[in-house]
Amino acid sequence: LMKLDFLAPEALAPRLRLHKVISPEKDKLETLYNLLCTLGYHSTLVFCNYRESVERVVGYLKARKFPCDMFHGGMEQPDRERALYKFRNGSCHVLISTDLAARGLDIPEVGHIIHYHLPVNEEAFTHRNGRTARWDATGTSYLILHAEEKLPSYIPEEMETVALPENPPRPPKSLWATIYIGKGKKEKL
């Protein structure tokens, strides 16, 4: 029996790195803020389990003057499309979302995935992480955990713990802005 293997050994190396971040508080907002500041302005998707949580996280980050946008099923379609467009074109580097963004969106070069809430099942974990490390790219997935939270069996226990600096500097504003010009009611400019 002959076996053909066209993949070079280095191609088999994992392209997705898993890390955990321990939050000293059950409310993980400050830990998320520090992690986002530490990561800088790299394309980052933050997953929450509920629409209300998405809105709460976005409100907190915007109050801290951290630019971000949200994406969930309770939003009007034009608002969702606008948020995705800004995320894709780089004028918004951080998108806070429910699992609605975990499937079917082809967003190239997402560098980081942050699980603000633990995914509800293995399928959600797989699809969330599938937004990064696509094709030949690498990516990093972070799980923010409170000390009392236990990892579900489908998430590997062996992962590096990332220690965050006390007060990381907020990254500078994006160099890009998105300008929307509507066509009006009669679709004329």
Question: Predicted segment positions?
Answer:
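Conserved helicase ATPase core of P-loop NTP-dependent helicases/translocases
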Residues: V54-Y60, K65-A102
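Conserved interdomain hinge at the start of the Helicase C-terminal
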Residues: L12-A63
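Conserved nucleotide-binding/hydrolysis micro-motifs of P-loop NTPases
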Residues: P9-A11, E25-K28, R51-V54, M75-Q77, ...
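A short helix-turn-beta junction within AAA+ P-loop NTPase domains corresponding to the substrate/partner-engaging
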Residues: L1-L7
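A short beta-strand element within the Helicase C-terminal
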Residues: R103-L118, T140-I144
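Conserved segment of the helicase C-terminal RecA-like domain
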Residues: V94, N121, N129-N167
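Non-catalytic terminal extensions of ATP-dependent helicases
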Residues: A63, N167-L189
